[in-house]
Amino acid sequence: MIVQVINGPNLGRLGRREPDVYGDTTHDQLAALIEAEAAALGLKAIVRQSDSEAELLDWIHGAADANQPVILNAGGLTHTSVALRDACAELSAPLIEVHISNVHAREEFRRHSYLSPVATGAIVGLGVQGYLLALRYLAGRPA
């Protein structure tokens, strides 16, 4: 099974941007961790990051068309993008929303997610391990 792992705005800056909040793992290191865990679980992970909402929408539309599960950390678009929510609602395979930090323990504006109502589940505040937990969940589910 192919799993789309999609990271949104500013996540390409992991390891440099607010390491006290997001840790010191870079996006390249995160991608390698995800790909290794996916392979160990018999999955193939396609890990992508973009600061462009349009590109994220294209990737989610592609996953919907291919009936592929998605692990999505939409970054700040989680709290602002109805368009991203609508694209995610089109998915028939599972959607797991992931956030590295505990968004519920941060600023008030981060506590609302447009994605959670259309997601299968959400993993927040467990650092980069959240992605690996999402993969383990998907490995136990048929797509």
From Swiss-Prot:
Annotated site (Transition state stabilizer): 17
Amino-acid biosynthesis as UniProt keyword: yes
Active-site annotation: 22, 99
Keywords (A to Z) from UniProt: Amino-acid biosynthesis, Aromatic amino acid biosynthesis, Lyase
Record-linked Pfam families: DHquinase_II
A biological process term (GO) from this entry: quinate catabolic process
Reaction catalysed by this enzyme: 3-dehydroquinate = 3-dehydroshikimate + H2O
Metabolic or biological pathway, per its Swiss-Prot or TrEMBL entry: Metabolic intermediate biosynthesis; chorismate biosynthesis; chorismate from D-erythrose 4-phosphate and phosphoenolpyruvate: step 3/7
Parts of the chain that traverse the membrane: none
Example of a GO MF term: 3-dehydroquinate dehydratase activity
InterPro entries registered for this protein in UniProt: DHquinase_II, DHquinase_II_CS, DHquinase_II_sf
Residues given in the record as substrate binding sites: 73, 79, 86, 100-101, 110
Top-rank EC class of the record's enzyme: lyase
Matches recorded under SUPFAM superfamilies: Type II 3-dehydroquinate dehydratase
E.C. numbers: 4.2.1.10
Family: Belongs to the type-II 3-dehydroquinase family.
Subunit (UniProt): Homododecamer.
Biological role: Catalyzes a trans-dehydration via an enolate intermediate.
Record protein name field: 3-dehydroquinate dehydratase
Native species: Mycolicibacterium paratuberculosis (strain ATCC BAA-968 / K-10) (Mycobacterium paratuberculosis)
Organism placement in taxonomy: Bacteria, Bacillati, Actinomycetota, Actinomycetes, Mycobacteriales
